[in-house]
């Protein structure tokens, strides 16, 4: 089951620098009279800009909230670093109430982020337009451009994301985080060694104890584009060690790292390793602090991964049982489960395609996420097997032209590029 994870949204929600750092243009007026609150806010923002996460940020968030309980942006930031997601949402909603009496910039920013903060951010794209307007009215506010860049990345609009990050760097001060996202744009441009060199340079500037998500996953993607599976996995294993050492695994389970390793193994024919990684990742869920509905979602993702792995193993009956389990979970989830139907059709299409039932696979694959390059890859394979060459070629072209920022593009792009040149 696939969806923008809460971790991505938390990271996207927390970027900023001192308003006084803006080189030109109007920026937010902070609605607090507490110098201590401003100091703590800047310290927390600086840590995030340097990929410093974990318990120290949680404590900073608590101190920030206590230093001025009526400071809307301070409470907002406290909500971002709060590991208990129910409490984080409660704090965010409180910041919205406080924002009604805050400055125009603070109020509009906090309200614009509602789509990225509630319901696990499933409608995060709706936050983009109000932030664009906010950026036009406050051209010197770096925070807005950093958030826009990440939301554009999440929406598969890499060029717009890069423009936003460049604006943020121009406003200043320059940061490792923005540089890492710009290195990610080099990947979309096909400049893999250059992107790795940028990541390595950025890493050297980081303080000890940093946990550079964007760097480790970016390096992984660069190796996937070049077909170097072992190097791709090595980067994620390094990140797993850093994630644990920082205590982040006590805030959000390490399952997403294992699932990424599982998927890389799966799509490169390392099926036993894939199954073990999916199962190992899920072990971090039952005793975690996640709300029960999110634990259920991750259980669904385990069944999803097992289904695809079993299908690749040729165990088609077992695979379909897993697919039916996912389908039942979605139905049982009622209204909340409806968002996962595209993920189910991707799964069913995957299983049917592996079983040689291409016509049935196509029926499902036409109902998947058309913005997901890997879903599109399966659709292209189905079209090609059915002799529908023009439609296959169009699908492969769509993958090559995609600007999706996640793991799906590096998994799909090499095959799509090769097929596009040979069909």
Question: What is each model feature region?
Answer:
Residues 38, 73, 106, 143, ...:
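Start-of-helix register in tetratricopeptide repeats
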Residues 47-48, 75, 82, 115, ...:
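Residue at a conserved register position within TPR or TPR-like alpha-solenoid repeats
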Residues 56-57, 88, 127, 161, ...:
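Single-residue signature of alpha-solenoid repeat helices
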Residues 110-118, 149-150, 331-370:
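Alpha-helical adaptor scaffolds
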């Amino acid at each position: 089951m696939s969806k923008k994870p809460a971790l991505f949204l938390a990271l996207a929600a927390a970027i900023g620098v001192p308003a006084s750092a803006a080189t030109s243009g109007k920026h937010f007026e902070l609605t607090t009279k507490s110098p201590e609150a401003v100091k703590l806010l800047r310290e927390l923002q600086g840590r995030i800009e340097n990929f410093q996460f974990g318990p120290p940020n949680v404590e900073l968030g608590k101190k920030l909230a206590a230093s001025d309980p009526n400071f809307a942006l301070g409470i907002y930031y406290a909500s971002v670093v709060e590991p208990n997601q129910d409490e984080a949402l409660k704090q965010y909603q409180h910041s919205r109430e406080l924002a009604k009496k805050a400055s125009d910039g603070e109020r509009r920013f906090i309200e614009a982020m509602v789509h990225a903060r509630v319901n696990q951010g499933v409608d995060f794209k709706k936050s983009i337009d109000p932030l664009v307007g906010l950026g036009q009215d406050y051209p010197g506010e770096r925070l807005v451009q950093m958030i826009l860049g990440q939301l554009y990345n999440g929406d598969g609009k890499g060029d717009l994301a890069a423009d936003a990050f460049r604006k943020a760097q121009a406003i200043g001060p320059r940061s490792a985080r923005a540089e890492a996202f710009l290195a990610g744009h080099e990947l979309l441009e096909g400049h893999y060694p250059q992107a790795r060199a940028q990541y390595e340079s950025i890493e050297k500037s980081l303080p000890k104890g940093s946990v550079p998500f964007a760097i480790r996953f970016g390096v992984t993607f660069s190796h996937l584009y070049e077909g170097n599976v072992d190097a791709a996995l090595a980067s994620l294993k390094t990140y797993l060690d850093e994630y644990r050492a920082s205590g982040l695994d006590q805030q959000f389970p390490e399952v997403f790292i294992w699932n990424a390793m599982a998927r890389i193994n799966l799509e490169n024919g390392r099926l036993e390793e894939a199954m073990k990684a999916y199962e190992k990742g899920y072990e971090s869920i039952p005793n975690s602090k996640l709300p029960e509905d999110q634990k259920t979602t991750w259980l669904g993702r385990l069944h999803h991964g097992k289904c695809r792995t079993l299908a690749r193993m040729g165990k088609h009956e077992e695979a379909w049982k897993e697919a039916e389990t996912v389908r039942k979970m979605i139905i049982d989830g009622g209204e909340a489960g409806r968002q996962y139907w595209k993920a189910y059709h991707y799964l069913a299409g995957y299983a049917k395609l592996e079983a040689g039932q291409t016509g049935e696979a196509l029926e499902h694959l036409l109902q998947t996420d058309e913005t997901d390059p890997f879903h599109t890859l399966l659709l292209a394979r189905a079209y090609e097997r059915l002799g529908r060459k023009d439609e296959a070629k169009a699908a492969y072209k769509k993958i090559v032209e995609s600007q999706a920022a996640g793991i799906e593009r590096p998994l799909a792009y090499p095959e799509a590029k090769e097929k596009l040149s040979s069909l």
